[in-house]
């Protein structure tokens, strides 16, 4: 303490000296500054320069730590179980205190047990009663991984007040869910409650963790979304060599040169691997340069899931902050003091010198785990042979059972209310709808559905360096998009964009890879072939070529490759519709058609449009090693003089494995060439249509990206405008029907009959006066209602005119947001004006009818009908 006081006094003296020096410098510079102010005047250019310099200054606002204390919790509306203890709970607290005293006496070097912290009402509650097993109604929360991920996203982490001690307060899960904040013990309690409700054998653990684990620091961890799944390489089964297979030619390359080349390649790989390992070691050394002075002392809480229930094959840990699962031998977990569930409490009696690697989670072993209560489940109870032999005596068994019954004490029910998560909260997930997680060379951002106008729900940004300054690539996940966009992958280095779509796009688009949205650029489009009539699977486009792959077509077309030549120069804008690119070559390939013989089934045909040639290659028969080929010289049907050109043998060059008589005839060759001419026209037309389709898809994608409309389910009544309007209309109809019923039950003569003496019989003149007063009063009310509607109509009109005048005066300086607000106000104002106008016109039409209807009712009223007969 004396050393601390001396340090404080030295710091105060240094601050006083520094303040005195600052004051002296201020006095010295005060007068020259005043002289300068008098001499220099600030011009407009100097002011603009100063404003520019000031705008470049960035002020960093320190982030406020999340505060979650008792003072921030409203305890006025909490139920009685939160504010007091039952007799059974008080008995349990006494048992826990007795257990704690015995434990402290037997283990004086161990820290005090975490048994009964205070709740939000400052009432001591045993930790096991804070767990409320609950099965949530959402299927996603039935498995441990998705349940832990939901809690990690839904809550915000608050660090422990003292990193070396467990918290003094342990709040209920309902309070934690309400405020969406909590420390590691709050996270673990909520997660354990939901896992036990889902059928898992889960326990809350009070122990010690690493600094990264306690601070939820993932900057040294690799993001799971960046790790690529390991591809299992399937070894190709080598076909057995055929008996009469052709032997490969003899290899005449030097074996010595091959060995030297292999050694050189291995040396290069070893050098690269060594360099990579050195770089990783250097980076790891930089990351671990700052050792934690509190290593092994930081208190942390997590969840233990034991094997057995829900087909869990092996026990594991769950960190509630990150929702990650770890082995029970992981280095992040440095020791365990105790653990508990909703039935019992266990104290770890094993040594944690080797972290948690040597711990045995046999909770039925009283040597390793000291339990608090008797008469509860003891999982994995394993008895030694000596104990088993000692338990053979029937009398001892009966006596032991009686003693256990006398000493057993059941755990009281949980004092926490039923844990409930509303559908809105379950959908929103993250606090305020957004959460950011920083990983090693990556940043993960999450949003709630419908929070962003473009449907963005997740974004993963990967960086090249540890400081996260140079972006490598971005992945963005979308939901509820009308264009079925699911994932957008942007590579910042190559500039390649890849869009992934779910089934349902208007053009059956599945994947779209591109660097620019301009037409006739490098791009790849993949389609859902089952949703297209033409069976198109993939289309690859470059400035000079276009390649299409097909499947399941009736003509067995599988491949089409089009080569384009330079476009003819025109003054108008070049496009596939106005000035298409000239096609130079079209190559088409076909699957095997089993209905045709292989000699007549075309496998590939090439239209050399510029050279006026057509090349055909047929499928190869199974018993042949070569295939038939033909080449046609396509000429014009008439010459320059108009004479018809006759088919000649030199116009068809063919190679046939087994020549046939009918294929040599000129008529057969002429008919084949005429058919190929028509097919060439069809292929050129289909290629031109493909170009137009690309333009249509690009235009559609630009419109979709600009509009980014979101779809809303018909069952989502809060967001679906049509359902909302229909519901409001139904409510309005029911309200009007209710008003009509109330109006029918009203006694319209009651206010006027009350003015007469009670029990007096009406005279004829009194009846006439009552009728007139009632009609006059109703007429006045109709007039007042019309005046009220007219006044509201005029008020809305004047306010709209003022707003329009304000817009005309400030139109130049308005921002796009202000213009959107103005247009929205005008739309709403016009809607209100139109409704008021309709109400006024309707009131004018119905007022006379209502007046006549009331007059008729008065004449038919049984109290006046006899007295008013004379006037009818």
From Swiss-Prot:
Which GO terms fall under biological process for this protein?
flagellated sperm motility; sperm axoneme assembly; spermatogenesis
- Its protein name is Dynein regulatory complex subunit 7
Q: Which residues form a coiled coil?
A: 1-64, 254-292, 676-706, 780-805
Query: Keywords in UniProt for this one?
Result: Cell projection, Cilium, Coiled coil, Cytoplasm, Cytoskeleton, Differentiation, Flagellum, Spermatogenesis
Which residue intervals make up region (Disordered)? 1-40, 231-281, 385-410
* Gene source species: Bos taurus (Bovine)
Q: Which InterPro entries match?
A: CEPT76/DRC7_peptidase-like_dom (IPR056290), DRC7/lobo (IPR033551), DRC7_C (IPR056292), MORN_DRC7 (IPR056291), Papain-like_cys_pep_sf (IPR038765)
Q: Where is the composition biased (Acidic residues)?
A: 385-398
Identify its protein family. Belongs to the DRC7 family.
- What role does this protein play? Component of the nexin-dynein regulatory complex (N-DRC) a key regulator of ciliary/flagellar motility which maintains the alignment and integrity of the distal axoneme and regulates microtubule sliding in motile axonemes. Involved in the regulation of flagellar motility. Essential for male fertility, sperm head morphogenesis and sperm flagellum formation.
The annotated subunit structure for this chain is: Component of the nexin-dynein regulatory complex (N-DRC). Interacts with TCTE1/DRC5. Interacts with DRC3 and GAS8/DRC4.
Protein location = Cell projection, Cilium, Flagellum; Cytoplasm, Cytoskeleton, Cilium axoneme; Cytoplasm, Cytoskeleton, Flagellum axoneme
Residue ranges annotated as compositionally biased, kind Basic and acidic residues, are 16-40, 231-240, 248-281, 399-409
Give the UniProt entry's GO cellular component terms.
Answer: cytoplasm; cytoskeleton; motile cilium
Highest taxon in the source lineage: Eukaryota
């Amino acid at each position: 303490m004396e050393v601390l006081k001396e340090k404080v006094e030295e710091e105060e003296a240094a601050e006083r000296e520094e303040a005195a020096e600052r004051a002296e410098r201020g006095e010295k510079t005060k007068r020259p500054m005043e002289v300068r102010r008098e001499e220099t005047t600030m011009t407009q250019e100097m002011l603009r320069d100063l404003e520019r310099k000031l705008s470049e200054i960035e002020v960093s606002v320190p982030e406020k730590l999340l505060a979650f204390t008792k003072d921030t919790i409203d305890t006025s509306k909490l139920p009685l179980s939160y504010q007091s203890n039952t007799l059974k709970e008080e008995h349990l607290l006494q048992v826990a205190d007795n257990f704690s005293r015995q434990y402290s006496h037997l283990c004086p070097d161990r820290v005090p047990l975490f048994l009964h912290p205070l709740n939000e009402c400052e009432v001591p509650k045993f930790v096991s009663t804070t767990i409320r097993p609950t099965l949530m109604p959402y299927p996603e929360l039935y498995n441990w991984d998705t349940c832990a991920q939901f809690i990690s996203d839904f809550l915000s982490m608050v660090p422990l007040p003292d990193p070396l001690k467990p918290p003094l307060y342990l709040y209920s899960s309902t309070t934690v869910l309400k405020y969406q904040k909590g420390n590691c013990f709050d996270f673990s309690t909520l997660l354990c409650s939901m896992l036990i409700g889902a059928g898992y054998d889960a326990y809350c653990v009070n122990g010690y963790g690493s600094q990264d684990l306690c601070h939820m620091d993932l900057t040294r961890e690799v993001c799971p979304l960046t790790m690529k799944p390991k591809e299992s390489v399937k070894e190709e089964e080598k076909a057995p060599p055929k008996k009469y297979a052709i032997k490969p030619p003899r290899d005449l390359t030097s074996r010595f040169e091959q060995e030297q080349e292999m050694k050189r390649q291995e040396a290069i790989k070893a050098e690269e691997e060594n360099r990579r390992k050195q770089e990783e070691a250097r980076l790891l050394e930089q990351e671990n340069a700052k050792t934690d002075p509190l290593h092994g002392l930081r208190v942390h809480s997590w969840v233990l899931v034991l094997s057995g229930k829900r087909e869990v094959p092996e026990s594991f840990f769950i960190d509630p902050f990150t929702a990650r699962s770890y082995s029970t031998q992981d280095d992040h977990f440095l020791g365990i003091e105790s653990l508990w569930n909703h039935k019992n409490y266990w104290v770890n009696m094993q040594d944690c010198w080797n972290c948690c690697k040597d711990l045995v989670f046999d909770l039925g072993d009283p040597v390793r785990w000291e339990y608090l209560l008797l008469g509860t489940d003891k999982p994995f109870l394993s008895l030694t042979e000596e104990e088993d032999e000692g338990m053979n005596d029937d009398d001892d068994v009966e006596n032991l059972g009686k003693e256990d019954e006398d000493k057993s004490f059941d755990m009281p029910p949980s004092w926490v209310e039923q844990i409930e998560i509303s559908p809105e909260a379950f959908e929103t997930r993250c606090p305020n709808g957004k959460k950011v997680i920083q990983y090693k060379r990556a940043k993960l951002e999450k949003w709630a559905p419908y929070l962003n106008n473009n449907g963005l729900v997740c974004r993963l940004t990967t960086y090249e360096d540890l400081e996260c300054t140079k972006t490598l690539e971005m992945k963005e996940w979308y939901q509820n998009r009308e264009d079925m966009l699911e994932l957008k992958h942007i590579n910042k280095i190559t500039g390649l964009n890849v869009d992934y779509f779910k089934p349902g796009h208007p053009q059956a688009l599945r994947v779209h890879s591109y660097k620019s949205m301009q037409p006739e650029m490098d791009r790849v489009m993949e389609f859902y072939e089952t949703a297209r009539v033409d069976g198109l699977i993939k289309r690859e486009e470059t400035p000079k070529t276009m390649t299409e792959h097909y499947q399941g077509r009736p003509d067995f077309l599988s491949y089409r490759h089009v080569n384009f030549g330079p476009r003819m120069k025109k003054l108008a804008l070049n496009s596939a519709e106005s000035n298409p690119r000239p096609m130079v070559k079209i190559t088409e390939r076909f699957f095997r058609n089993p209905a045709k013989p292989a000699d007549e089934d075309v496998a590939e045909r090439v239209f050399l449009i510029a050279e006026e040639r057509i090349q055909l290659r047929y499928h190869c028969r199974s018993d042949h090693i070569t295939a038939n080929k033909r080449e046609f010289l396509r000429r014009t049907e008439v010459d320059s003089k108009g004479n018809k050109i006759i088919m000649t043998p030199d116009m068809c060059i063919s190679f046939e494995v087994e020549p046939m008589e009918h294929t040599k005839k000129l008529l057969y060759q002429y008919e084949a060439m005429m058919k190929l001419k028509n097919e060439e026209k069809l292929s050129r037309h289909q290629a031109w249509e493909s170009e137009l389709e690309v333009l249509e898809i690009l235009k559609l994608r630009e419109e979709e990206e600009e509009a980014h409309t979101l779809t809303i389910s018909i069952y989502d009544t809060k967001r679906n405008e049509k359902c909302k309007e229909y519901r409001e209309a139904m409510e309005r109809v029911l309200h009007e029907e209710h008003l009509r019923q109330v109006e029918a039950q009203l006694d319209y003569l009651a206010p006027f009959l009350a003015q007469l003496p009670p029990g007096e019989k009406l005279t004829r003149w009194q009846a006439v006066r009552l009728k007139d007063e009632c009609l006059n009063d109703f007429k006045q009310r109709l007039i007042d209602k019309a005046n009220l509607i007219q006044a509201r109509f005029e008020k809305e009109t004047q306010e709209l005119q003022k707003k329009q005048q304000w817009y005309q005066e400030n139109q130049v300086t308005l921002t796009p947001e202000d213009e959107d607000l103005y247009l929205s106000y005008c739309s709403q104002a016009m809607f209100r004006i139109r409704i008021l106008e309709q109400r006024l016109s309707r009131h004018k039409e119905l007022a006379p009818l209502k007046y006549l209807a009331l007059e008729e009712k008065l004449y038919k009223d049984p109290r006046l009908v006899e007295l008013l007969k004379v006037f009818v």
